[in-house]
Amino acid sequence: MVAWEYALLVRRYQGQGRNFHVSFVWYGPDGSRRDVTTYGDTAIAHLNRVGREGWELVAAAEDVNNVQGSTEVHRYHLKRPLT
């Protein structure tokens, strides 16, 4: 039987008009939280990076709030076999 570990990559877009900020945060299987924004400016860049580390995307979800400005939160759920 295969045992898995799980992680979460969160992309947050916050903006109003021409001003916006995009950040990426990695929630590791050990409970750690790390800002990984400097590793790339697109979700694809981040997913390819962790894919090379053995992570597989298993689900994605998006929340959008346009009440005051614009906020988008994308959650990428990943897994990989425990070694």
What residue spans do the PLM features occupy?
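Terminus-proximal functional modules
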Residues: 1-83
